[in-house]
Curated annotation (Swiss-Prot):
Species lineage: Bacteria, Pseudomonadati, Pseudomonadota, Gammaproteobacteria, Enterobacterales
Protein name: Bacterial non-heme ferritin
Binding site for Fe cation 2: E50, E94, Q127, E130
Organism per entry: Escherichia coli (strain K12)
GO MF annotations, alphabetized: ferric iron binding; ferrous iron binding; ferroxidase activity; identical protein binding; iron ion sequestering activity
Gene giving rise to this polypeptide: ftnA
Entry's Gene Ontology BP terms: cellular response to iron ion; DNA damage response; intracellular iron ion homeostasis; iron ion transport; response to oxidative stress
């Protein structure tokens, strides 16, 4: 049985994953608007992936006999000055998610909630991959610079980049 503190924290994380999905969907819209179709497709796939992260938490809460609580989610930021700025923000967001997952895993361990700690290990591993993925995109954008040709090739690569890297 989950302690009330863990139920609250799992619900918070579930809602943060929902926000992540909406954020990446909004970023996808920005990319589409600015004709970065490869980046838009990549971010749409990533938005779907974040929704599966939310669903895993939702299912864990119900599987443990608890009620998931979906809260009102704030509108994600929608304006960026460049593709580089947008991906800098994705990286910062993934760092925030990593911090929150680590805090959640720590709370599970502190509360001797070993089943939840075990469940969260998938997220710990996933966040390592997420940060690595977005850091690699930022590095490529930095190498490409602001030239149209460089951005074109990065955008083209993003269209084929698997979110499960």
């Amino acid at each position: 049985m989950l302690k009330p503190e863990m139920i609250e924290k799992l619900n918070e994380q579930m809602n943060l994953e929902l926000y992540s999905s909406l954020l990446y969907q909004q970023m996808s819209a920005w990319c589409s608007y600015h004709t970065f179709e490869g980046a838009a497709a990549f971010l749409r796939r990533h938005a779907q992936e974040e929704m599966t992260h939310m669903q895993r938490l939702f299912d864990y809460l119900t599987d443990t006999g608890n009620l998931p609580r979906i809260n009102t989610v704030e509108s994600p930021f929608a304006e960026y000055s460049s593709l580089d700025e947008l991906f800098q923000e994705t990286y910062k967001h993934e760092q925030l998610i990593t911090q929150k997952i680590n805090e959640l895993a720590h709370a599970a361990m502190t509360n001797q909630d070993y089943p939840t700690f075990n469940f969260l290990q998938w997220y710990v591993s996933e966040q390592h991959e997420e940060e690595k993925l977005f850091k690699s995109i930022i590095d490529k954008l930095s190498l490409a610079g602001k030239s149209g040709e460089g951005l074109y090739f990065i955008d083209k690569e993003l269209s084929t980049l698997d979110t499960q890297n």
